[in-house]
Amino acid sequence: MINLRKTHPLMKIINHSFIDLLAPSNISAWWNFGSLLGICLVIQILTGLFLAMHYTSDTLTAFSSVAHICRDVNYGWLIRNLHANGASMFFMCLFLHVGRGIYYGSHLYKETRNIGVILLLTVMATAFVGYVLPWGQMSFWGATVITNLLSAIAYIGTTLAEWIWGGFAVDKATLTRFFAFHFILPFIITALVIVHLLFLHETGSNNSSGINPDSDKIPFHPYYTIKDTLGLMFLLLILLSLALFSPDLLGDPDNFSPANPLNTPPHIKPEWYFLFAYAILRSIPNKLGGVLALLASILILLIIPFLHTANQRSMMFRPVSQTLFWILTANLMTLTWIGGQPVEQPFIIIGQLASILYFTLILVLMPLAGMFENYMLEPKW
């Protein structure tokens, strides 16, 4: 069996990736989120597959088919709740994974980071088209508002929006194609995950101290498989608690009403994991400017490595950068809160200040902090 694991063409790849892989001996629980994201992806694909067996992507029957899944299909309510709350867990792990990368300097592995940002954008696209499928009020109006942002693009905007819609507004054609996108994108994500791992295993994992760990490495199995299993237990505990006790906690009450193009909800908002970007979009009183700020809020992750001015890789021994990082975290939480509030004072000005602070922290203050820390570490005699 040992020989087969090391000689079989397929088993050999799995062996080098998950069993005999050498990993730094000092990586903390913050390195669990990669494997948890893999588990989340598997859960989402499996639950999504069973939901797709009963769902109909037609404007007349979509809402009813979701109700049918919850009422008439064996454990349909559980599958639907796991899928809906699994998306929230997916994004929670994603945000923690990205935050870990920034804090410990893992983003300096540029190829891994680039694929990671593409993965983040693809997952966000998948979640957006998936949110439209139940065809509730917030599904319909969320799709209308977000796809309408394409019309802000000069010359081709309106044509592009109508091309995405398959008509002059969000309707049956839009729902059908969004279902097709939502079905195919997770498999594209799976392919990107494999590429992400391929690039990661070219360099090996970073570690919390940020120094080269080659002198002290241990095999992935059994040490990190057990550690990841503990993380998985916590993930399943939270996911099952959400799905079984408060399945609608993170949803929107408006989505219990079927889509009605003649009745606009008082406050249109996306799912909680998009609220920070939605707050940045709304903070600029110009359509094109808002769209550009929305894109910049995510794509800024691509330039973070070029803004890394510190001589040390990790923030573990950089107190000024640490402080700014946690201010950035608090700022993102503030933006998430603002995104869920109505467009009125004082929320407008708080959102604008938080948006300015978000970009200032990443583009100006954190690079300056790195330079300052370099200066403080230089011998002065």
Curated annotation (Swiss-Prot):
Gene encoding the protein: MT-CYB
Family designation: Belongs to the cytochrome b family.
InterPro entries the record matches: Cyt_b/b6_C (IPR005798), Cyt_b/b6_C_sf (IPR036150), Cyt_b/b6_N (IPR005797), Cytb/b6-like_sf (IPR027387), Cytochrome_b (IPR030689), Cytochrome_b_C_euk/bac (IPR048260), Cytochrome_b_N_euk/bac (IPR048259), Di-haem_cyt_TM (IPR016174)
Lineage: Eukaryota, Metazoa, Chordata, Craniata, Vertebrata
Extra remark beyond the main annotation: Heme 1 (or BL or b562) is low-potential and absorbs at about 562 nm, and heme 2 (or BH or b566) is high-potential and absorbs at about 566 nm.
Heme found in the keyword field: yes
GO cellular component annotations of the record: mitochondrial inner membrane; respiratory chain complex III
Residues given in the record as a ubiquinone binding sites: 201
Membrane topology: Multi-pass membrane protein
Name of the protein: Cytochrome b
Entry's transmembrane regions: 33-53, 77-98, 113-133, 178-198, 226-246, 288-308, 320-340, 347-367
Ligand binding (heme b b566): 97, 196
Keyword list, A-Z: Electron transport, Heme, Iron, Membrane, Metal-binding, Mitochondrion, Mitochondrion inner membrane, Respiratory chain, Transmembrane, Transmembrane helix, Transport, Ubiquinone
